[in-house]
Amino acid sequence: YPFEKYDQIIVSEFMWGGMENITLTHNTDRTMFDSKAHPDHSSDGLVAHELAHQWFGNLITTRNWANIWLNEGFATYLSRLYITKDRGVDEGDYVRLNEIRGFMRADKAKRRPTVDFNYEEPFELFSSHVYAKGSLILTMLQDVLGEDGFWRSIKDYTIKNKLKTVETVDLKKSIENTTGQNLDWFFNQWLYEPGFPEYEVSWNYNQRMKELSIHVKQIQDLKTTSLFKMPIRILIDNGKKEEHIIWVEDLDSVFKIHSNKRPKMVIFNSGMRVPSILKTNKSVADLRYQLKNAPNALDRIWAAQELSKKKGRKIVEYALLECAQNDSFWTVRSEAYSSLSRLKSEYQTEDFDWIRTKEKDNRAKRSFIRSLRHQPKDLEVIKFLNDIIISDTSY
């Protein structure tokens, strides 16, 4: 820790969530929860974010507003690392999924680069283009450089720029000095230009050649977005689960991977490491298998979302309901209920009983309750909601 002390103070009706003054963080009183609100709500992410600012924001601070991601992106990233360390990989990945969603909402509202000198007021820069996308950029740098190269670069950047102001080029110099890699291509596409890749992916298997062919197109509008060069994780299940890395950089590419048998599952961009939109030729059967068998929670969530767009309503509803009641991770169960809501599914008596007696996570229960908006307002629904209001331990 770089300073002589660290204190936190709660400020009533504070206009921000938190403010990282050197050695004394101000937090809003909205971060204070009573015992009934835990564990459904937590301030851990905010507390970790503001503490991370003591290094990235105070010990080192951005030279200008255009590079504010060096403060906010780093703090958001390190906050997520804390959640991952404290609660596990699935929890950290779900935080990252919400970063992806936040970044894409911001991009839809206003497309702009992360490093942006084109603004009227500094306040307009404080969006998911710098918080969420900045955090995602650091995760992708971690994948490109590897764990050792990434952390040696961050250490070099922190030590060399202690008590100085910085711009993005200073981080890039530390990476080049430490690893010897020229990452012009990475910084240009993710920091100095706006947007994200959109992939259209299909695959087929050649039994005679024992070969899986993956056809990848980048289909983003090249008038507003560049082509992206990125390492992509491919997960294959052909009796055992194997992970491969392919480098996608062209408009249209075909990649061939040896496989002794036809894969039961092929996942492009496994774990959603690259923020992107993905279109595939996966059938309902493919998505059902992925929903049940993908080892990464984000890949199961993606399958649930895609199933909500498919025809074959009853078999899709059955798969989603089975996931909602059996997946090991609460966020996947919650997202499955959200997908059922998009299908305007109606629940049976046993589904209400299952929520009453088996679902232990209040956040998943909340998602189920939200999905009742499409349920007929009969006596069973009214009784269920009344029981929740009267007897449930959660707000």
Positions of PLM-derived features:
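Alpha-helical repeat scaffolds
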Residues: 349-356, 381-389
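Non-catalytic accessory/interaction domains
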Residues: 52, 148, 161-350, 354, ...
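C-terminal structured domain segments across diverse proteins
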Residues: 23, 329, 360-367, 374-377, ...
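Hydrophobic alpha-helical and helix-loop surface patches within well-folded domains
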Residues: 1-216, 266
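Alpha-helix C-terminal capping/termination sites
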Residues: 37, 143-144, 306-309, 342, ...
